[in-house]
């Protein structure tokens, strides 16, 4: 199989953090989750229930014969590939549960996420376990290419190469924000200066908050590393979904679950450690960046820290500054991220303050402010956050 071996290198200023938070430089151990349907199975059980990819793959090459990459991250490289997937053929599971069926054409382009190094093998296997649970929970899991959904469709895991196969969606929210920001600078006017640089910002915010609510309440997982680079955009195809009441022309879908864990796994003991991969200033919540948090032996990322990360992702989409704190170094961003609840104060003093909306408490500012409350317990749940859009 073409994906069995890769030796070649998607993150921005990412801090790698181990499950026990002993140092910032050591990579995490294997993520093992102790919750399946609110039970605590033995570790060998946690290794099951993974959707397996049963089809052949061929990695795409450019004119020079090099593999074509969609992107790179802390643990992995994402390659462009093609696969012949028989129409209606079900994906295989490592355990008996019923399998989603992929409605396919003869050949399609897919994304193949492969480990960069040996210690990433367990990280990707754990991500495959998370994505298999997501796929089995999704109402669109039986037809993963249709519109809707909240997560990039997962086609399966390849055990021989520790690779994940997903729907190919080359456009990230971060790239879209940068494109929109460039266009906004070229066409700046007093008529539009109070609008977010990303068109249909409200629709984007609604999609992502609904998706986060679904992940937290229906699937029962924390994403752990939400940022513009970990949201992919899929163009909507049906005419009825376009130009309809100012809705987004894209489905905004979460990707990269290498730092995800089940919410109930935070009560795990030392027998069932939870692995978390990366924290990305400025999107990491301040409580995750304290010295005591780094030394903690328990789960750090929570639904509340996901809310914070999404709030700053939406702030970036409004201002056009993908890293929020424009013109700062990585060390400066880290220092400012430790007081991330002040992010709006920084933006208000900068060139893009008008993008928050008219007045000090403009619409964008109001939405973001709720999500970046200093104390985690003061932040709304995703469902409560949606009330702003009612």
Predicted regions and their residues:
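ATP-binding glycine-rich loop module of kinase domains
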Residues: 74-136, 140-141
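Activation segment/activation loop of eukaryotic-type protein kinase catalytic domains
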Residues: 229-283
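Activation segment signature within eukaryotic-like protein kinase domains
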Residues: 204-205
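Conserved structural core of kinase catalytic domains
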Residues: 152-196
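Juxta-kinase regulatory segment immediately upstream of eukaryotic protein kinase catalytic domains
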Residues: 2-69
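A conserved short helix/loop substructure at the end of the activation segment
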Residues: 372-384
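Conserved C-lobe activation region of Hanks-type protein kinase-like domains
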Residues: 288-356
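Conserved HxN/HPN-centered segment at the entrance to the catalytic loop
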Residues: 136-157
């Amino acid at each position: 199989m073409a994906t069995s071996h890769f030796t070649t290198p998607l993150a921005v200023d990412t801090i790698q953090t181990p499950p026990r938070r002993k140092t910032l430089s050591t990579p995490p151990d294997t993520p093992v989750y102790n919750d399946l349907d609110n039970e605590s199975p033995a570790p060998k059980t946690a290794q099951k229930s993974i959707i397996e990819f049963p089809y052949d793959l061929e990695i795409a090459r450019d004119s020079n014969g090099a593999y074509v990459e969609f992107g790179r991250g802390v643990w992995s490289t994402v390659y462009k590939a093609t696969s012949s997937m028989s129409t209606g053929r079900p994906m295989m599971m490592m355990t008996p549960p019923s399998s989603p069926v992929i409605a396919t054409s003869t050949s399609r382009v897919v994304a193949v996420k492969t480990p960069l190094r040996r210690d990433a093998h367990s990280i990707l296997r754990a991500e495959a376990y998370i994505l298999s649970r997501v796929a089995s929970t999704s109402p669109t899991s039986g037809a993963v290419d249709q519109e809707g959904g909240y997560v990039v469709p997962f086609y399966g895991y390849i055990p021989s190469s520790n690779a994940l196969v997903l729907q190919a969606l080359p456009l990230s929210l971060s790239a879209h924000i940068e494109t929109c920001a460039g266009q906004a600078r070229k066409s700046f006017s007093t008529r539009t200066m109070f609008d977010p640089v990303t068109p249909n910002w409200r629709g984007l915010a609604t999609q992502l908050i609904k998706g986060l609510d679904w992940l937290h309440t229906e699937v029962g997982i924390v994403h752990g590393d939400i940022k513009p680079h970990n949201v992919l955009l899929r163009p909507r195809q049906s005419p009825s979904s376009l130009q309809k009441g100012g809705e987004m022309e894209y489905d905004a879908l979460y990707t990269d679950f290498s730092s995800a864990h089940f919410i109930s796994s935070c009560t795990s003991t030392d027998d069932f450690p939870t692995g978390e991969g990366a924290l990305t200033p400025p999107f990491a919540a301040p409580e995750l960046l304290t010295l005591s948090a780094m030394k903690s032996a328990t789960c750090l990322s929570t639904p509340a820290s996901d809310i914070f990360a999404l709030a700053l992702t939406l702030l970036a989409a409004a201002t056009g500054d993908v890293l929020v704190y424009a013109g700062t170094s990585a060390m400066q961003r880290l220092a400012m991220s430790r007081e991330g609840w002040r992010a709006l104060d920084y933006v208000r003093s900068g060139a893009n303050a008008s993008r928050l909306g008219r007045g000090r408490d403009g619409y964008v500012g109001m939405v973001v402010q709720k999500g970046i409350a200093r104390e985690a317990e003061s932040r709304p749940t995703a469902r409560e956050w949606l009330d702003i859009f009612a």
